[in-house]
């Protein structure tokens, strides 16, 4: 037993060479990390040069697998909550009166504590505060009532007091029996009625709720009551189409009983995804490419062909002098295998990833390696027609290498007639004078490479993703054909391969021609697999749109730079031979394949929410320019990013492109109309609609300065004073008379400060008992309650900050309007033992700041009005009902094994 429990030490690979004919096993996420590393090596060459003159940038390669896990967690997270009772919208403060209390709207009290203090010189903090307040509204209003507490009263179902949204239990002990009976009668009248929503029985009752929260709740309830049945049908139908394309059966196990009468279901996301949302993101082409690899690319092995092919064609003699025979027995190093991975990535993402040759003096000096690469390169890659796998430089180098190989006559000499231009392959060779000019690269027609005289891009039946309707057909192979590796490829051929065999025979390379003739079935299986991977597994919202794909080659030839430039990866000469001798054979489908549509929908939904946030923030500078004097579009971009989910930011910034996004990129993205519908987007838009009134965000620009004495009433009749529930506040019920208000703009304040008369001018206005308005700037408003004298910093606080200093014989003044403003409520409490002058001071206390907000934050009400705010209709689902989020059903089911694998 001890021997069985003993853990075996892991075998550590100490050699860069590989074992056997199976070279490696690469999964989608692993290949995405590898591709990201290689792409970043190219991208950061330019970025690093640019950043040497600016700030430091973290070039750490992110963990793609962790990012995908985080996005899956976002899909599982609910943007709403299921509760038994709604939050308390109104609370009451007990005074010494037996028939008057203070009713407080808790929404404004809570909202005043959300976010940071706004200042003029920190626009990013202002934007961040606005977003926090909007998210607070959305979060508090997004709830579903389920199994609410109720009681029976005379055969009627009556809601328990805590369900009504009004907190009044602290008031009951001080009330008279008559008042308590009156409130109890009102509570007994809170009858829960039976209703019907979308064929489901529900409870309907009247409660209290603050206006912004109720807007979100009402919009959310309307979303549920709309059933989303057509959206669900569209999503399931689209998933079935996608499953047919990707050979995946859609599983309906989650939807087994969602149509039952006791089921309430919520669909938070929708399919298909709007691809414009994903591709409109600035500088996102590389990030989308990496996501396509990570979510779709299958796990596979690099399989070598039958070794007898080379042994009976290239190395059948004892003495082998040909370039192919020399390289036949070589084994790749780890670095060379990395180049093989790059080659297959370029083949699987034609046009998006293109190859160039490394500057390696050792290999450039080895003519055998170059010549072999020149031959197999023309059979591996496509250079023109509709797309390319190569740069123009690499295509020319391969032409030169093929030229050298044809002229290298190591067996027998053949006749060569040279052309007049001196270009590579400008000659005719052999007895039949085969014209080798046809193998010189022509990106306009694809001549000389795999795209020569073949239809390698096809448009046929409509694809599930509307933006990528193309089907890739390397070597003219239809990806719908079933592949049996033992027989597939026999008797198949295509134009470039035939011409290569003819040219090799004409050049006297009979053994090499025999080798390629024997390799043809293996070669066709290789590209048949690649076609299937591209057209089935890699078909995704992250696939390059057709219009961008069609523009890649013309832009490359013309040297034009567009939004989706190709990524150039460097490979060695000898890696072309190793890539030709190995085929990427899929062994397992990608683990993310069935949930990829859900990941795409979550990502697109979050992007849409970010875009809506940025649109509204971009309008604020025009609405309140004085509070955003120093604001730039980059500020609201940063604010939205800071408050967005980390997983979404990580996907957008996979290639560290955020450090290089400019204002043009941002504004173009904000103004584009594409959005991905989802529950989160619906609630976010409704929250912004509620936030259009800045007073609902506890922000105001109506702040006044007026000298007002704190009331010090005589206590001649203590009983009467207590019954009145006396209190004082610096919040105005109406704006002051306009003819008594002096408006102080920034310009007036600065002018008087420069003249050294600012304080004197304010004093003169207040001595005349007039008002001074400091408007034009939004201020953060806090609400506080006191039952004793408030601190002096609140009583005598000014609605501005004014600092003066001297430097170098000059006087400097600094004025800021955007300061924190406090609305305070002072509740007077007296005892029967107090004397008439207990509240009177020798020197009066003055308050300086007055605030006007056109909202009822606090009201003094009679006891009979405590439940007068019950005016909102709520829908609650019965306890026997089940509430189910069926968003997780928007993923495909069982991956089918590829036929004949």
From Swiss-Prot:
Q: Which UniProt keywords apply?
A: Virion
User: Where is it localised?
Assistant: Virion
User: InterPro entries under this entry?
Assistant: Inner_layer_core_VP3_Orbivir, Inner_layer_core_VP3_Reovir
> Primary place of residence?
virion
Keyword Cytoplasm listed? no
Which cellular components does GO assign to this protein? virion component
- Specify one Pfam family: Orbi_VP3
Q: Does the keyword Membrane apply?
A: no
Extract the GO molecular function terms from the UniProt entry. Answer: structural molecule activity
Tell me the function of this protein. Answer: The VP3 protein is one of the five proteins (with VP1, VP4, VP6 and VP7) which form the inner capsid of the virus.
The entry's family comment says:
Belongs to the orbivirus VP3 family.
The identity of this protein, by name, is Core protein VP3
Which organism is this entry from? Bluetongue virus 1 (isolate South Africa) (BTV 1)
Its lineage opens with: Viruses, Riboviria, Orthornavirae, Duplornaviricota, Resentoviricetes
């Amino acid at each position: 037993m001890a021997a069985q429990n003993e853990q075996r030490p892991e075998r550590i690979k100490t050699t860069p060479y590989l074992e056997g004919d199976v070279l490696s096993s690469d999964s989608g996420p692993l290949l995405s990390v590898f591709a990201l590393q290689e792409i970043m090596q190219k991208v950061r060459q330019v970025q690093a040069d640019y950043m040497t003159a600016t700030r430091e940038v973290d070039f750490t390669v992110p963990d793609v697998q962790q990012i995908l896990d985080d996005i899956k967690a976002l899909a599982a997270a609910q943007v709403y909550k299921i509760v038994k009772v709604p939050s308390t919208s109104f609370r009451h403060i007990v005074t010494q009166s037996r028939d008057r209390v203070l009713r407080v709207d808790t929404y404004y009290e809570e909202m005043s504590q959300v976010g940071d203090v706004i200042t003029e010189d920190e626009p990013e903090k202002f934007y961040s505060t606005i977003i926090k307040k909007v998210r607070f509204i959305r979060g508090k209003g997004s709830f579903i009532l389920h199994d609410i507490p109720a009681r029976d009263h005379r055969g009627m179902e009556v809601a328990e007091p805590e369900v009504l949204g009004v907190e009044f239990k602290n008031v009951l002990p001080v009330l008279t029996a008559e008042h308590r009976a009156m409130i109890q009668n009102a509570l007994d009248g809170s009858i829960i009625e039976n209703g019907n929503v979308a064929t489901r029985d529900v409870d309907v009752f009247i409660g209290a709720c603050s206006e912004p929260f109720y807007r979100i709740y009402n919009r959310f309830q309307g979303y549920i009551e709309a059933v989303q049945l057509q959206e669900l049908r569209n999503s399931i139908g689209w998933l079935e189409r996608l499953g047919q394309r990707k050979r995946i059966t859609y599983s309906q196990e989650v939807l087994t009983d969602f149509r039952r009468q006791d089921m309430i279901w919520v669909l938070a996301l929708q399919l298909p995804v709007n691809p414009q949302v994903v591709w409109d993101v600035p500088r996102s082409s590389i990030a989308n490419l990496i996501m396509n690899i990570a979510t779709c690319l299958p796990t596979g092995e690099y399989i070598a062909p039958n070794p007898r092919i080379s042994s009976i064609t290239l190395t059948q003699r004892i003495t082998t002098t040909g370039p192919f025979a020399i390289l036949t027995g070589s084994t790749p190093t780890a670095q060379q295998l990395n180049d093989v991975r790059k080659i297959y990535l370029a083949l699987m993402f034609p046009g998006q990833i293109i190859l160039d040759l490394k500057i390696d003096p050792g290999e450039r000096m080895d003519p055998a390696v170059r010549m072999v690469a020149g031959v197999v390169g023309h059979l591996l890659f496509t250079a023109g027609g509709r797309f390319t796998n190569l740069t123009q430089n690499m295509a020319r180098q391969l032409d030169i290498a093929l030229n050298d190989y044809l002229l290298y006559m190591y067996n027998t000499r053949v006749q060569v007639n040279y052309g007049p231009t001196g270009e590579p392959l400008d000659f005719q060779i052999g007895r039949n004078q085969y014209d080798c000019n046809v193998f010189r690269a022509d990106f306009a027609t694809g001549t000389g490479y795999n795209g020569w005289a073949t239809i390698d891009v096809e448009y046929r039946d409509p694809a599930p993703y509307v933006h990528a309707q193309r089907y890739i057909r390397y070597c003219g192979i239809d990806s719908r054909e079933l592949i049996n590796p033992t027989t597939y490829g026999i008797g198949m051929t295509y134009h470039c391969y035939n011409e290569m065999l003819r040219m090799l025979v004409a050049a006297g390379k009979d053994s090499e021609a025999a080798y390629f003739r024997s390799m043809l079935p293996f070669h066709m299986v290789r590209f048949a697999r690649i076609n299937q991977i591209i057209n089935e597994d890699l078909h995704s919202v992250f696939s390059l749109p057709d219009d961008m794909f069609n523009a890649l080659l013309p832009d490359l030839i013309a040297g034009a730079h567009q939004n989706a430039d190709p990524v150039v990866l460097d490979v060695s000469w000898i890696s072309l031979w190793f890539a030709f001798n190995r085929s990427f054979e899929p062994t397992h489908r990608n683990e993310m394949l069935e949930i990829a549509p859900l990941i795409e929908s979550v990502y697109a939904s979050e992007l849409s929410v970010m875009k809506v946030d940025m649109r509204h923030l971009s309008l604020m500078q025009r609405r309140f320019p004085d509070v955003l004097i120093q604001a730039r579009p980059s500020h609201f971009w940063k604010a939205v990013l800071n408050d967005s989910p980390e997983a979404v930011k990580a996907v957008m910034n996979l290639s560290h492109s955020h450090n290089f996004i400019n204002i043009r990129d941002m504004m173009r993205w904000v103004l584009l109309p594409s959005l991905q519908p989802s529950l989160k987007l619906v609630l976010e838009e409704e929250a912004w609609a509620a936030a259009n009134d800045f007073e609902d965000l506890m922000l105001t620009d109506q702040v006044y300065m007026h000298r007002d004495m704190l009331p010090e009433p005589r206590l001649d009749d203590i009983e009467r004073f207590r019954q009145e529930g006396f209190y004082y506040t610096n919040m105005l019920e109406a704006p002051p008379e306009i003819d008594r208000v002096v408006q102080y703009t920034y310009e007036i304040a600065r002018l008087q400060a420069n003249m050294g008369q600012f304080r004197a001018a304010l004093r003169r206005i207040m001595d005349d008992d007039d008002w001074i308005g400091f408007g034009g700037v939004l201020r953060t408003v806090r609400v506080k309650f006191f039952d004793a004298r408030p601190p002096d910093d609140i009583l005598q606080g000014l609605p501005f900050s004014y600092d003066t200093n001297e430097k170098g014989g000059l006087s400097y003044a600094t004025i800021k309007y955007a300061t924190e403003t406090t609305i305070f409520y002072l509740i007077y409490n007296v005892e029967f033992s107090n004397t008439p002058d207990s509240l009177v001071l020798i020197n009066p206390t003055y308050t300086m700041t007055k605030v006007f907000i056109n909202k009822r934050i606090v009201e003094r009400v009679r006891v009979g009005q405590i439940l007068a705010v019950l005016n909102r209709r709520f829908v609650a689902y019965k306890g026997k009902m089940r509430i189910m989020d069926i968003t997780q059903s928007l993923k495909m089911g069982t991956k089918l094994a590829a036929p004949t694998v």
